[in-house]
Amino acid sequence: MGMVAILHGVKPKFLEECLTNDETVHTLEADFSGQNPDCLDLDKSWGGLTYLLGGNETGFSSDEPTSQAITNQQVINEEDILGYTPAFYLTCEQVAQIANALGELSHDTLKSRYHPNAMTDIYPCGWSDDDIEYLLGYFDELRQFYQTQSQKGHAIISYIF
C-alpha cells in the first residue's frame, strides 16, 4: 500500500474536541472507497502534489498557503502518530482561504511547475514525465474536496497513513 494521504472534512466543534482531547481524532475512519464526500484518499500523490502546490524539494509544506493543503505545521498532538505522521489540521477559515487559492490554479500552471528531475527525493520517488497526469487527476479531486468542505464550513484533519 505505501504511504497515502488521508484528509477528513470535520465540523469545527469536532476539531475543537480533538484539540482538547487528542484521543478524539482516533474516531475518524479512512474511506478508501471514495464514497464519503468528507474523506479524501490522495493515494501516493501527496508529495508530488505538495511540491506542485508550492512545497519544498522534499514534498512537504512551505509558507505558500496552497502547499499546506495536505500537510502543514499545525498538529493536534506531535507525539500521537496516525500511521506515519501526527494529525495535521486547518481551521474552517484556513480551508476557505486554501479552497479559493486552489480554485485559481490551472493545470497549465501546475504543469509548468512539474520537474521530475528535481523531485528525486519526493515520495514515492522515481517521477517521470508521464506522472503529471496522475498528479493532475488527484489535484482535481483535492480542489473539489476543498470546495465542498469550504461550502460546508468544515475544518480539515489530515495525516499520512
Annotate the PLM regions.
Residues 1-137, 141-144:
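Acidic (Asp/Glu-rich) sequence patches and key acidic residues
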Residues 134-161:
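C-terminal or internal capping secondary-structure element at the end of a domain, subdomain, or sheet
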